Amino acid sequence: MNPTPQSGSTIIPCLRYRDAHAAIEWLCKAFGFTRHAVHEDGQGRVEHAQLAYGNGMVMLGEVRDNAFGQHIAQPDEIGGRETQCACVTVANCKSHYEQAKAAGAVIVDDYAEKEYGGAGYSCHDPEGHLWYFGSYDPWQPEQG
């Protein structure tokens, strides 16, 4: 099976937030995402949103008790842990780290140069989702 050709990433993380409007604002301010699309239901809750970063994207929406939502736990429901982490490649990791820290990101793995190349750090957003940002580009051929 081959992926459908497209202009962006073929793998797009999807997250749920209790307050998706606040999450969108914070993710744009702290991490530099831009709104690609935000769709609300009849009560003004975020049904589906797309936030872009470079040629990548995350999708998000409000926590819901539907067939899909019943398979997703929020970090605070499972002791602050995650089973997955969104990894984002950034051009200037040090300045991205400083921006995220200034916006209140909870740093869980401090900024550091990595032995395998590049630099990176990990943090939690206000609802506890784990993120990794780094300058290492896994698509680049290995130097050797």
Where are these regions (language model features)?
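Short, surface-exposed ligand-recognition loops at beta-strand->loop->(often short) alpha-helix junctions
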Residues: 16-19
